Amino acid sequence: MPQQIELRNIALQAAQPLVHGVSLTLQRGRVLALVGGSGSGKSLTCAATLGILPAGVRQTAGEILADGKAVYPCALRGIKIATIMQNPRSAFNPLHTMHTHARETCLALGKPADDATLTAAIEAVGLENAARVLKLYPFEMSGGMLQRMMIAMAVLCESPFIIADEPTTDLDVVAQARILDLLESIMQKQAPGMLLVTHDMGVVARLADDVAVMSQGKIVEQGDVETLFNAPKHTVTRSLVSAHLALYGMELAS
């Protein structure tokens, strides 16, 4: 399995250019946070990595490399990169139980799909009474439960990399904290490389090792989390850090 995934000069276009020459490097055991405002191109960059661009959007330049070798995005999905999506309710088939979702995921990747394996993954993400959870349909579960189930399926993939696209969006504060605890636990126990897409600098401060700031389809600043918080250079970065510090009655040094 690869130790590094590199996005090199990715450019995306629809009726007009959307993402301009984005380069990022994911490394096993490290969390790279991709931050920026809505519409900055974060989720499109993730979609390009997985080869699941929306209709009408095409990649016009760039490549993806695994340990220095060019690869097709479709060869990464599931096997090398697991995904935790922004809106879990739209990610599950409403006609299938959690057991069907989990089992199909395992079978598609050639992983064990026995009930003991599924139960262990569900228990690992803190969902109680795994036997009951496996019988539930998506509409019978809360947003927090569905997000935990999506993380359980990422665990089942046993992929060396994870893309987590706004994993705490639309969750209440308690559910957000539990999801962050889970992601932190996964990093400690399995040490995957993680691309964490978020607009919440509090999440960045807690989980990230490195940060890339995106604005208008471009990476405007990139560095380790400590440097970025203490000495942000770009206007967008300074605005993000300043807004975060203001929540705690603090100001960014000029």
From Swiss-Prot:
Keywords from UniProt, A to Z, are: ATP-binding, Cell inner membrane, Cell membrane, Ion transport, Membrane, Nickel, Nickel transport, Nucleotide-binding, Translocase, Transport
Specify the enzyme's EC class, one word.
translocase
**Mode of membrane association:** Peripheral membrane protein
Annotated catalysed reactions: Ni(2+)(out) + ATP + H2O = Ni(2+)(in) + ADP + phosphate + H(+)
- What is one cellular component GO term in this UniProt entry? plasma membrane
What residues does ATP bind to?
Answer: G36, G37, S38, G39, S40, G41, K42, S43
**Domain named ABC transporter: which ranges?**
2-241
Domain of life of the organism encoding this protein? Bacteria
Q: What is its EC number?
A: 7.2.2.11
Note the Gene3D superfamilies from the entry.
P-loop containing nucleotide triphosphate hydrolases
Main subcellular location of this protein, as a coarse class: membrane
Q: Which PROSITE patterns match?
A: ABC_TRANSPORTER_1, ABC_TRANSPORTER_2, NIKD
List the Gene Ontology MF annotations in alphabetical order: ABC-type nickel transporter activity; ATP binding; ATP hydrolysis activity; nickel cation binding
Q: What does this protein do?
A: Part of the ABC transporter complex NikABCDE involved in nickel import. Responsible for energy coupling to the transport system.
The family classification in the record reads:
Belongs to the ABC transporter superfamily. Nickel importer (TC 3.A.1.5.3) family.
**Assembly and partners?**
The complex is composed of two ATP-binding proteins (NikD and NikE), two transmembrane proteins (NikB and NikC) and a solute-binding protein (NikA).
NCBIfam families reported for this sequence: nickel_nikD
For this entry, the protein name equals Nickel import ATP-binding protein NikD
The gene is nikD
